[in-house]
Every structure is written in structure tokens, then in C-alpha cells.
């Protein structure tokens, strides 16, 4: 058994050695302040980040990350690293988000930039390569953004991916592969995958409707027609309303003063509505006409949709109404297995967070109970003694 364990450990170590880690940040100490750059873009009041493990955690040191600290603020913070291209290999972007403030409206996503990023001028309109991560605003928006820049235009994924909306740490992973496929994982579990060309509007449609094709004039696409043999019954036509036969003229009605009395109108019980002949199958029905398609002359395949020619920066460029989100464990690599291995610790972190928060909640309940005024407790005791409960209804036995 020990030999098997050693082999597994050796294989994982070999995987880690062979993979390229282009960027990794775990915020172990205050050194982040010299590595990350705040934007000074004019006209925006940017919020500040603080290094903290938050109010509940698994490890007070290992769980430290950057926390948004000011409500109703834009945030713009970035870091550059050695540039690289993912040509011919996978691209993995991974990080954790902890909305411990129970966020109501705000972003939790990461942007990936090329080297043209001017860090001190970064803002919402700054071009980026990739935008990935959760975004929450009210009950209607709880989604994972996956946006790629292609030929100068940002393209949003056509699928809806739901993000986590609780108060614990969650791991978000984007994997882009050289075969133009992708995967999105949350907490190391695949939540979406597919083909880049199919799930984004990078390219024009392969096929278009033939502009020369026209539906034939004699094409009958009505599945049913009125029955030509059906005839309206002779007694069909009845008025919709009739005078109320039970109504009588009031005794004090004066025809000279009030005019000629007329009984009020009521719905006619014999009224059958507008007659229409019954429908029968159309013998000339040819089915719905399908517009024929042709190859789109504007379509050109691109085998390099996955490729980013240059990546050299990441940034947190977002808005939050209620601050308190903690970002941590940034990783950009070419090895999905190595990223998954690093992500396994997040499950243990969640367990520790839930345990501490549960203890905190219980302590808060005990504190509130202890701080209750004595007269409230006396009233509760009196209620218990007098049996002040809802009356029980008596029922006859069957």
C-alpha cells in the first residue's frame, strides 16, 4: 500500500514539475502592496482592499486574501507578470471568491490582460483578453461570466452558468484547450463545457438562408381548413343579450317624467357565439416551408479561437454595493491536473469556515439570549407555567 501511495505522490510531483505556472498569488503577507497596483483613473472613487482571512476561516494565515472594504465603490487593482502565449497548450485561469458579506449586488470576477495594460489607468472600458468569474445583483443575476476578446470585440458566452451565492469560499476554474473546447468548474466540479465556436459568436454562421430562394406561391402550409360541407344550423343565430323576462316596471315609474320603461338586458342563455365551420385536415397541406440554406461566403473557420497571443496581467476591475468579498488563490497555468490538485484544499477550507461560522452563530444566539431583559424571561416562564398555548379544538370521535 505504501508503494502505491509513493507512486501516486511521485506522479503528482512529476506533473507539477512539468507544468508551467505563469502566475500564482496566495497573499501570504503584506508584500502584495508592492506587487499590485491601484488604478488612479480620473473621475472614479476607487475602494481599497485589505489583507484578511475574514470573519470565519479554516486557517488564519493560509486563508488570507484581498477583501473589498468600502461599500458602493469601484475597485481597480492589477498585477503584471512575465508575458506568455498559450499557443499549442491549455490555458487554466483559477481563483477563489468568498462573499462572506452575503453580497446583494457586485462583481466577483477576474480580468486577464495583455501587456498593453496601463495599470494606473485601468477602468471599466480598458480592453482585456478574458473576463471570468461570478456576478451577483439581486435575485435575477447570479451568473458566471465567461467573456473573450476576439478581433477587438468582447464576446459573451451564450449559456447561463449559475454561480454560488452563499458566504463561503468557492473555487472558479476556466480551462481553454487547443482543440477549441472549454470547461468551467466550480469547486473542482464541472458545471459547463463545450465548443468555443458553438458557444460564442466569434464567427459568422456557417450557413445562411439562400437569398435567392422564395416560397412557391402554391405552397400550402395550413394544416387544417374549414369544412366546406359544414353548414350553420338554422337556429344558430341568437342575440347575445335579451331583456330580462323577470323584470317589472317599478310602481313609481312615471313614463312622462322618466321616459318609456325598458327592462334591463341580461346574457342570453341560448347565445352560441359567432358560428364558424369545423376544421378538417387540409388535403393540400405540404408542411411548413423550410428556407433552404447555403454556405455563408462571410464564414472563415479559425482553428486558433483558443489562442491568446500575449497574457501578462490580471486585474480586479469591479463594482460592489456591499463590500466584504475576499479574493485569493490566483493561478494561471497550462496544466488542468495541477490546478485541480491545488483546488482540493478549498473543500477543507469550506469545512473549516462552516464549522467556525456555526460556532459563531451559536455564540451569538447564546449572547442574545443572555442579554434579554429579565421581565421578558419572566413573561416567558409565566407563559410556560400557565400553559398559555393555542386552544385545542374538540372533535367528535367518528
Curated annotation (Swiss-Prot):
<keyword id="KW-0479">Metal-binding</keyword>
<dbReference type="InterPro" id="IPR009169">
    <property type="entry name" value="Calreticulin"/>
</dbReference>
<keyword id="KW-0256">Endoplasmic reticulum</keyword>
<keyword id="KW-0106">Calcium</keyword>
<keyword id="KW-0862">Zinc</keyword>
<dbReference type="InterPro" id="IPR018124">
    <property type="entry name" value="Calret/calnex_CS"/>
</dbReference>
<keyword id="KW-0430">Lectin</keyword>
<feature type="region of interest" description="P-domain">
    <location>
        <begin position="198"/>
        <end position="308"/>
    </location>
</feature>
<dbReference type="InterPro" id="IPR013320">
    <property type="entry name" value="ConA-like_dom_sf"/>
</dbReference>
<feature type="region of interest" description="C-domain">
    <location>
        <begin position="309"/>
        <end position="398"/>
    </location>
</feature>
<feature type="binding site">
    <location>
        <position position="128"/>
    </location>
    <ligand>
        <name>an alpha-D-glucoside</name>
    </ligand>
</feature>
<protein>
    <recommendedName>
        <fullName>Calreticulin</fullName>
    </recommendedName>
</protein>
<feature type="region of interest" description="N-domain">
    <location>
        <begin position="20"/>
        <end position="197"/>
    </location>
</feature>
<feature type="compositionally biased region" description="Basic and acidic residues">
    <location>
        <begin position="207"/>
        <end position="251"/>
    </location>
</feature>
<dbReference type="GO" id="GO:0006457">
    <property type="term" value="P:protein folding"/>
</dbReference>
<comment type="function">
    <text>Molecular calcium-binding chaperone promoting folding, oligomeric assembly and quality control in the ER via the calreticulin/calnexin cycle. This lectin may interact transiently with almost all of the monoglucosylated glycoproteins that are synthesized in the ER.</text>
</comment>
<feature type="region of interest" description="Disordered">
    <location>
        <begin position="207"/>
        <end position="257"/>
    </location>
</feature>
<feature type="binding site">
    <location>
        <position position="135"/>
    </location>
    <ligand>
        <name>an alpha-D-glucoside</name>
    </ligand>
</feature>
<comment type="subunit">
    <text>Monomer.</text>
</comment>
<feature type="region of interest" description="4 X approximate repeats">
    <location>
        <begin position="191"/>
        <end position="255"/>
    </location>
</feature>
<keyword id="KW-0732">Signal</keyword>
<feature type="repeat" description="2-2">
    <location>
        <begin position="273"/>
        <end position="283"/>
    </location>
</feature>
<feature type="disulfide bond">
    <location>
        <begin position="105"/>
        <end position="137"/>
    </location>
</feature>
<feature type="compositionally biased region" description="Acidic residues">
    <location>
        <begin position="373"/>
        <end position="387"/>
    </location>
</feature>
<keyword id="KW-0677">Repeat</keyword>
<feature type="region of interest" description="Disordered">
    <location>
        <begin position="334"/>
        <end position="398"/>
    </location>
</feature>
<feature type="repeat" description="1-4">
    <location>
        <begin position="244"/>
        <end position="255"/>
    </location>
</feature>
<feature type="short sequence motif" description="Prevents secretion from ER">
    <location>
        <begin position="395"/>
        <end position="398"/>
    </location>
</feature>
<comment type="similarity">
    <text>Belongs to the calreticulin family.</text>
</comment>
<dbReference type="Pfam" id="PF00262">
    <property type="entry name" value="Calreticulin"/>
</dbReference>
<feature type="repeat" description="1-1">
    <location>
        <begin position="191"/>
        <end position="202"/>
    </location>
</feature>
<feature type="region of interest" description="3 X approximate repeats">
    <location>
        <begin position="259"/>
        <end position="297"/>
    </location>
</feature>
<dbReference type="InterPro" id="IPR001580">
    <property type="entry name" value="Calret/calnex"/>
</dbReference>
<dbReference type="GO" id="GO:0005509">
    <property type="term" value="F:calcium ion binding"/>
</dbReference>
<feature type="repeat" description="1-3">
    <location>
        <begin position="227"/>
        <end position="238"/>
    </location>
</feature>
<feature type="binding site">
    <location>
        <position position="111"/>
    </location>
    <ligand>
        <name>an alpha-D-glucoside</name>
    </ligand>
</feature>
<dbReference type="InterPro" id="IPR009033">
    <property type="entry name" value="Calreticulin/calnexin_P_dom_sf"/>
</dbReference>
<dbReference type="GO" id="GO:0036503">
    <property type="term" value="P:ERAD pathway"/>
</dbReference>
<feature type="signal peptide">
    <location>
        <begin position="1"/>
        <end position="19"/>
    </location>
</feature>
<keyword id="KW-0143">Chaperone</keyword>
<dbReference type="GO" id="GO:0005789">
    <property type="term" value="C:endoplasmic reticulum membrane"/>
</dbReference>
<dbReference type="GO" id="GO:0051082">
    <property type="term" value="F:unfolded protein binding"/>
</dbReference>
